[in-house]
Amino acid sequence: MPTPKPLVLIILDGWGYAPPSNANAISLARKPNYDKLLTDFPNTLIHTSGRYVGLPPGQMGNSEVGHLNIGAGRVVYMDITKIDLAIENKSLFKNQTLLDAMKHAANGRQLHFFGLLSDGGVHSHQNHLYALLRMAKENGVERVFVHPFMDGRDTLPTNGVKYVDQLQQKMREYGIGKIASISGRYYAMDRDKKWDREKLASDAMLHGRGEGGRYKDPVQGIKESYNKGVTDEFIIPFVCVDDNDQPIGVIRDGDACINFNFRADRARQITRVLARNSGITKDGGRELDAADTLDATIPRDTIPKDLHYTCMTQYDPKFTLPIVIPPDTLTHILANEMAAMNMRNLRVAETEKYAHVTYFFNGGIEKPYPGEERELVQSPKVATYDLKPEMSANGIADVIEHAVEKGAFDVIVVNFANADMVGHSGKIPPTITAVETVDSCLGRVYNVVRKKGGAMLITADHGNAEQMIDPETGGPQTAHTTNPVPFIFVAEDAKKRFSLRPDGALQDISPTMMGILGIPQPKEMTGHDLRVDLTVKK
């Protein structure tokens, strides 16, 4: 078949497959365009979790992992897997970056751990914190404080009280550490430059000012939050105090801090807030995006100086802070193979997923490759996306329609965020609206691509919206799933000529694209073309 132009890769974020049910917002939605594409063109299901994407067995996938695997055309072993192995073989306890932080703290200073406290495995894992606490004990650090960020998004909404109780048990077992503050991830892990949220978290961590109150027992604080209808993700930052009502452990000048989140996108902003006076960049972060707004919202003179701030992974290539697990360099990924063939490609997403179709899709490289253009559509300014389930999908469809009509691009990579971002609310009606909005956009894109003689690959990076009710509790499920996702090959006469093989994974998408585009597949790509040519006699 002739090379289609353009080839459009559509990533329906959070659009997994599960049998129809009252918990499946995708099956409950009216989606005539998607259903027709599924009927008229070759399709299969592919894996997006566990060992298929470089995660521990049974671990649900996520957007970062998904886009890395898609763009790399191979299984990319994730930081969680690397850290798990380092704990297992004890190399983590000999890591020089961590030893330097421990040595700094053992010199009469305080050591602070902070990050997402859960077993969700998307941004962090509580087992990593437990290992760090053991290491601090072994290295003679005396004053250790933990500032947990509560999850409720990649875990059940009220599991946080269990995680805090488990943490306190571990601290008693090891004889080290106290919980100093608690913040919902909504505040401490924002990624949309909403500095007012980070201010509430940093006020608790730095100044002992808790908008959510002061508690001797953090479990009591969490339970009171639940009683007010506020679940883990949205817990208003509160401070833990001693018998004299004094904050137990605020971050002070010269302290050591270790952010134990391994996923970068939601660790970046809190790092920018806290490390501005501690060598985050040569210019103290002043050259970074929205630095003036940050300094106006959280004045620089209110931030501690000379922190020994350590990042678990590389949160931003511009940061000059110590890193525990440095990034791998991926070569011969789809992006540089397209560049080598002088192919023009466009990346399109709204704010929430822009980094995924650019930075993560490009193997952790921020700078665009030659021939690569990017179009960012602003996400709506709402507290949570169930309030605006349409998000900016129609704006994305506008961009794609214009780009296809113009005929300037060989490849277009697009992410529709709705099913994932609204699915995280755990609310079925708005998630149905989100799915139906994306379906309408699919119809628009298909019409213009067909008219221009192009082709589409429709898939997802992980599941979410297909499982909105927790089967054990009967309550809302806000986390991703381990379900497979659809993969549809939309092209003229595709159903006559091709079938798609089963048991594929995200690593197979780039090889499939290269097969369609006629680009030789490099040996570094270990995925395989998902197409089976029915016209070739065996």
Swiss-Prot record:
Keywords: Glycolysis, Isomerase, Manganese, Metal-binding. Substrate binds at residues 123, 153-154, 185, 191, 263-266, 353. Binds 2 manganese ions per subunit. GO terms for molecular function: manganese ion binding; phosphoglycerate mutase activity. Its EC number is 5.4.2.12. Catalyzes the interconversion of 2-phosphoglycerate and 3-phosphoglycerate. PANTHER family: 2,3-BISPHOSPHOGLYCERATE-INDEPENDENT PHOSPHOGLYCERATE MUTASE (PTHR31637:SF0). Transmembrane segments: none annotated. Pfam families: iPGM_N (PF06415), Metalloenzyme (PF01676). This is 2,3-bisphosphoglycerate-independent phosphoglycerate mutase. Pathway: Carbohydrate degradation; glycolysis; pyruvate from D-glyceraldehyde 3-phosphate: step 3/5.
